[in-house]
Amino acid sequence: MNIQILLLLILFSTFASTKSDVSFTVETSLRTTLQEVNADSGLVMLMDSAGNVIGKSSLSLLNGKSLEDEVYTTVRDMGTLAVPVSLIPVLEKGNVSLSDTVDVGNGIYNHNGKEIRDHNADMGGYGEITLQQAILFDSKVGVIKSLSPYTTIKTTYSPTEILNFYHSIAVSDHSICSAKTMKEIQQTFEMVVSEGTGKPLFSDNVKIAGKTGSVIKE
């Protein structure tokens, strides 16, 4: 199985004093993570609050070399990491609410002839959950059943496009949605870390918000 790691970070402060410090830290962290999870390749992009990419690294453990710069702008399937891009317009129109419930059953669902599986399908799935919980626990079935009646869920973006989207959420850019929707999304991203699939990153010392994502390649 080909395993890839994609990590996009937005920092409002950093202890690294120089660009070289940031680059070294980013590459070292990526290499360590790839080895820990036995992944084939991965990339990291680090953006500051002003929207500047202050560090990035892409590595392949298959040959130990950095990937080409095009990897940051190449469109690919971003999986559930891209779900909020489709979610926001649907929330804005009032088609759905984060408190709406959806039955994901055993975590296996046939959508347009394709089998969709949640990461915990082998353990029986989540059953009935809210749309917000589908985001927190990275339930593909919950998201598709909730949103597909109202929109086409696009998941193909470049890492740079996705990073810019999450930066807009981090800095409360109301050009992409209303203040109400922005607050709901930000609170949900905080809960991903405090209660959901991002819980391993939770810290009592600093507030962290974000979204985990996954994609299965046949």
Regions found by a protein language model. Name each.
Residues 46, 100-107, 180, 184:
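Beta-strand segments within the central parallel beta-sheet cores of soluble alpha/beta enzyme folds
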Residues 30, 34, 51, 74-102, ...:
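Active-site SXXK
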Residues 39-41, 71, 77, 81-82, ...:
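Extracytoplasmic
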Residues 3-13:
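Sec-dependent N-terminal signal peptides
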Residues 96-150, 171:
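Conserved catalytic neighborhood of penicillin-recognizing serine enzymes
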Residues 133, 141, 145, 149-218:
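A penicillin-recognizing enzyme superfamily signal
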Residues 19-82, 93-95, 114:
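Short pre-catalytic segments that frame enzyme active sites
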Residues 48-62, 91-96, 107-108, 137-140, ...:
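Glycine-rich, acidic and aromatic/proline-enriched surface loops and short helix-turn segments
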